[in-house]
């Protein structure tokens, strides 16, 4: 049996870039372009890893009960605020987990590039 190959974040290993903007109903400020470079998705479609870049702007986020994210900022600066207004800032070298059920505001203060791992458990019957 052959072991699965390691997944690196080398530029030539990325999938096709996905360009989007926050939904209008969620926007707080700006209309930033977001670019997601996927590097890995598991066979069940529950676990994704990649690189994400974004222009300055802010939008509301609401993670479902089964969705969570780990990220590590490579460059730029972001701020995440909870509904009570408590804010945390992250810059190069900082990392964070956004837990399942989190709601708040995600703000890109300076153009940002981060690595991310997203896990979203699929509903079971």
Where are these regions (language model features)?
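Short, charged/polar surface micro-motifs in flexible loops or helix N-caps
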Residues: 44-47, 55-59, 77, 122
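Short, conserved beta-strand element in jelly-roll/cupin
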Residues: 64-80
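Ligand-binding loop in jelly-roll beta-barrel domains
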Residues: 92, 100-123
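A short, N-terminal "cap"/entry segment at the start of jelly-roll beta-barrel domains
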Residues: 1-46
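Short hydrophobic/aromatic-rich beta-strand segments that constitute the beta-sheet cores
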Residues: 61, 80, 114-116
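Well-ordered beta-strand positions in beta-sheet-rich domains
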Residues: 51, 87-89, 103-105
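Short acidic-glycine-tyrosine-enriched beta hairpin
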Residues: 84-100
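Conserved short histidine dyad/triad with adjacent acidic residue
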Residues: 48-65, 99-100
């Amino acid at each position: 049996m052959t072991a699965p190959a390691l997944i690196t974040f080398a530029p030539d290993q990325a999938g096709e870039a996905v360009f989007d903007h926050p939904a209008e109903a969620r926007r707080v400020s700006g209309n930033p372009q977001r670019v997601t470079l996927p590097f890995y998705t598991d066979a069940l479609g529950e676990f994704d890893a990649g690189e994400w870049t974004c222009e300055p702007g802010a939008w509301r986020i609401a993670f479902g009960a089964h969705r969570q994210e780990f990220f590590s900022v490579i460059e730029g600066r972001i701020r995440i605020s909870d509904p009570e207004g408590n804010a945390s800032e992250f810059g190069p070298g900082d990392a964070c987990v956004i837990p399942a059920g989190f709601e708040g505001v995600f703000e890109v203060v300076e153009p940002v590039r981060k690595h991310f791992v997203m896990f979203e458990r699929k509903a079971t019957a």
